[in-house]
Design a protein with these regions (language model features):
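Helix-breaking motifs and short loop linkers at transmembrane-helix boundaries and internal kinks
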Residues: 64, 96, 117-122, 183, ...
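Conserved MFS/SLC helix-loop-helix module at the cytosolic interface between two early adjacent transmembrane helices
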Residues: 82-121
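Cytoplasmic helix-loop-helix junction between adjacent transmembrane helices
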Residues: 127-164
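Helix-loop-helix hairpin linking two adjacent transmembrane segments in secondary transporters
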Residues: 152-153, 158-208
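Symmetry-related core transmembrane helices of the 12-TM Major Facilitator Superfamily/SLC fold
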Residues: 187-204, 402-420
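Transmembrane alpha-helices of Major Facilitator/SLC transporters
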Residues: 282-306, 320
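A late C-terminal transmembrane helix in Major Facilitator Superfamily
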Residues: 347, 355-406
């Protein structure tokens, strides 16, 4: 009996889902609507990630803390995000997408409750930490679930990427509008977000993903690798053959997301000074414009080669940072608005290029960990930027510090574009 249950049938399934082995039995891919539905949990969790942004002024007034403490609260989010990326990708590839996504959404709902009732800075930092953990799971398991259900269709990386940037843009404007128009702003904003996360839980429950662990048969038939065994908590990585693909993805994505962090950290205060208003919905609208730009660019660039997409990212990121530095020194509105649109385009193109390259080249049973590696590299740079900028601003003044950081991000983007141009054959 035992011998009849263990024939070497799984061997043909060792190839990535995007490139099935010849002769392997293939099931029909899920309907396209399932790919769209799978994007919603990613959108919902990224709405949470930025929903707090317009409300920091409310908390500062209620809890009485300064800019230095605010920097530490932001850092709690980055710590949670990076910590989740150390384990979420591996766990998702070994256990499946749902066992990672469901706890992430539940953590997001808990974070909403803490935000809504935060009695202290410590509680606020705890909510940001939980938000970071939930977001880290979203970029690992959530985005991998979208590409899994796409079954090799180009729609998968596109929707996974646009879901992230669209959610990140909706969060600030939703929170800004509700906080200006509804009573009890923090309770209202995070009550609505908790409902959105509950609907995302329902979507995850009905996702037509396999019950078994993704890639389990592939790992059983293939020789042991660093991705199929070893520690559950580790720096996310990709197979040796895909390291060059990860490097090219990071060359566009890391400077791009750093530029959006740079613009978001300075843009609202500059806009407030230029227009003479502190309306929270206006700051949220600025963030939405940035991420709508990212979404639009991703749909516009869904057909060109990945190399072209990454080069567009580099050019847009360099232009965005130089435009913001110009706005800081001239006090002009036009370069500030240009920096918003260009930064969104830089992140959107870099993220789409990186995700497309990894989903195409990395085996399916390492896909979530590959997504985690891409995002860990990008968020590590983008997360460190506002913290370092805050301390350098105290020492040198805001204009000098912002100029130095803007030029540094521009230099990184230019170097990344040069790498892509030189290694174009690896980014088809």
């Amino acid at each position: 009996m035992t011998e009849t249950r263990t024939p070497p049938v799984p061997a043909p399934r060792t190839a990535p889902a995007t490139r099935p082995a010849p002769g392997a039995p293939t099931a029909p891919p899920p309907p396209v609507r399932e790919v769209w539905f799978a994007t919603w949990p990613v959108v919902a969790l990224f709405i949470l990630s930025n929903a707090a942004m317009p409300l920091y002024g409310v908390w500062q007034h209620q809890l009485g803390f300064g800019s230095g403490t605010l920097t530490l609260v932001y850092a709690a989010y980055v710590v949670g995000l990076l910590g989740a990326l150390l384990v979420a990708g591996v766990a998702s590839d070994r256990l499946g997408r749902k066992p990672v996504l469901v706890p992430a959404l539940l953590l997001g709902i808990v974070a909403c409750l803490v935000y809504a009732t935060a009695p202290s800075v410590a509680a606020l930092a705890a909510a940001r930490l939980l938000t970071g953990i939930a977001t880290g799971a979203a970029v690992s398991a959530g985005m991998a679930a979208v590409t899994d259900l796409a079954a090799g269709r180009a729609l998968g990386p596109l929707l996974a990427s646009t879901g992230m940037v669209l959610g990140a843009g909706i969060g600030p404007v939703l929170a800004g509008v509700l906080s200006e128009t509804a009573p009890a702003p923090t309770v209202t904003v995070f009550g609505v977000e908790a409902v959105l996360l509950a609907t995302a839980l329902a979507v995850v429950a009905r996702m037509p993903l396999p019950r078994s662990r993704p890639g389990r048969d592939a790992r059983a038939a293939a020789p042991a690798t660093a991705g199929s065994s070893g520690s559950w908590v580790r720096l996310p990585a990709v197979p040796r053959a895909n390291r060059r693909h990860l490097a090219l993805g990071l060359a566009g994505f890391a400077p791009g997301i750093s530029a959006t962090a740079f613009v978001l950290s300075l843009g609202p205060s500059l806009l407030t000074g230029l227009l003479g208003t502190a309306n929270r919905a206006l700051a949220g609208g600025m963030a939405l414009a940035m991420f709508l730009s990212a979404t639009g660019v991703q749909f516009a660039l869904r057909r060109p080669a990945v190399r072209t997409v990454l080069l567009v990212s580099g050019a847009a990121t360099v232009s965005a940072t130089l435009a913001l530095v110009t706005a800081i020194h001239t006090g002009a509105l036009a370069p500030l608005l240009a920096s918003v649109v260009l930064a969104g385009a830089g992140q959107g193109a870099g993220q789409l290029g990186g995700l497309t390259l990894l989903s195409r080249e990395v085996p399916a049973h390492r896909r979530a960990e590959a997504n985690a590696a891409l995002n860990a590299g990008g968020y590590l740079l983008a997360g460190a930027l506002p913290v370092a900028d805050g301390y350098l601003s105290d020492a040198l003044g805001l204009p000098t510090a912002a100029t130095l950081f803007g030029l540094a991000v521009a230099a990184l983007a230019a170097a990344g574009a040069a790498l892509v141009a030189l290694r174009g054959k690896d980014a088809r």
